[in-house]
């Protein structure tokens, strides 16, 4: 894993950080690298209410906020920024607002590395809107001053379109930590945790707990 001055993580929902990057972020933190996580929404419209249900539509926002805070504690993230956008509306944010928000984060943290989603291969509209905003904002920075972008892609055609991920972080030592971070997001991850605990877990799911893949984004100019 590379040595970094500061890692800035930008995702739209609580649990995005855990699914994609819990082990990678914990590894950076263990090395003493500052990590800032900007979570754009609180996942107010999350599809699940617990398994069995323990949340309501009214209580879910506050529950997911607490889950986010707990997952960050598990990973070791101490600089959590809750950016205040609303779940499932990120794609409707004016460019000047969301781009300005991201530019302020970059100016404040001066990251050498940004972790976010890869545009076109992130499936959910909020994921795609976040990815697009990160690319637009970083592209405006002079080339020699830009942070590197290592991005998460998980659409079915990602590998076919982008090739194999050029970064595959071995997180074997953080497998149990990643599971604990999943457990922190209890309202959303119950069914997935049951799959992970199954003796019939397949190779893809197992690798999910041992390797975190990323694609480096290259600007045309």
Residue ranges, per PLM feature:
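Active-site rim/loop-helix segments in enzyme catalytic domains that contact anionic ligands
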Residues: 1-109, 139-145
